[in-house]
UniProtKB/Swiss-Prot annotation:
Active site: H89
Positions bound to 5-amino-6-(D-ribitylamino)uracil: F22, A57, Y58, E59, T81, V82, I83, F114
Key words of the record: Riboflavin biosynthesis, Transferase
GO MF, any single term: 6,7-dimethyl-8-ribityllumazine synthase activity
Residues annotated to bind (2S)-2-hydroxy-3-oxobutyl phosphate: G86, T87, R128
Lineage: Bacteria, Pseudomonadati, Pseudomonadota, Gammaproteobacteria, Pasteurellales
Keyword Transferase on entry: yes
Pathway field: Cofactor biosynthesis; riboflavin biosynthesis; riboflavin from 2-hydroxy-3-oxobutyl phosphate and 5-amino-6-(D-ribitylamino)uracil: step 1/2
Similarity-based family: Belongs to the DMRL synthase family.
Pfam families: DMRL_synthase
InterPro entries registered for this protein in UniProt: LS, LS/RS, LS/RS_sf
GO cellular component: cytosol; riboflavin synthase complex
Name the record gives this protein: 6,7-dimethyl-8-ribityllumazine synthase
EC number(s) stated in the UniProt entry for this protein: 2.5.1.78
Organism of origin: Mannheimia succiniciproducens (strain KCTC 0769BP / MBEL55E)
Gene designation per UniProt: ribH
Length: 156
């Protein structure tokens, strides 16, 4: 039986990291985790990483789409934080970001890793940005690299 599974090292991969500025006190930690994982575990060169900042999580899909359409990147990591408030705004933003990012990956055939935190409160977001629950930015970066390597195997 042949088993295909992507590894994490991708030293020649070109990766875009797209991050929302809104909730930057959390998102900055996600970026640090993602970039650290790309460089340290994935062995991606600094010059092959592009950081793109957008206003908020709702704007992530459009920027991700443009980056995917440019054909300059082997993978894209989308990072942000949406914290539930007292209105339905959470559902619109979280759903729009999630659906939009997912569509880009499927339509462009470029791996887009979803590293957008959708939490009930600030404490949960902080936990997932590098404290109790690990760093979801780092996890998303590793997913992106694994998919780059897996797709290369599938196409070989």
């Amino acid at each position: 039986m042949k088993v295909l599974e992507g590894g994490l090292a991708a030293p020649n991969a070109k990766v875009a990291v797209v991050v929302a500025r809104f909730n930057s006190f959390i998102n900055d930690s996600l970026v640090e985790g993602a970039v650290d994982a790309l460089k340290r575990i994935g062995q991606v060169k600094d010059e092959n990483i592009t950081l793109v900042r957008v206003p908020g999580a709702y704007e992530l899909p459009l920027a991700v789409r443009r980056l995917a359409d440019s054909k300059k990147y082997d993978a894209i990591v989308a990072l942000g934080t949406v914290i539930r408030g007292g209105t339905a705004h959470f559902e619109y933003v979280a759903g729009g970001a999630s659906n939009g990012i997912g569509h880009v990956s499927l339509e462009s055939n470029v791996p887009v890793a979803f590293g957008v935190l959708t939490t009930e409160n600030i404490e949960q977001a902080i936990d997932r940005a590098g404290t109790k629950s690990g760093n979801k930015g780092a996890e998303a970066a590793l997913v992106a690299l694994e998919m780059v390597n897996l797709l290369a195997q599938i196409n070989a």
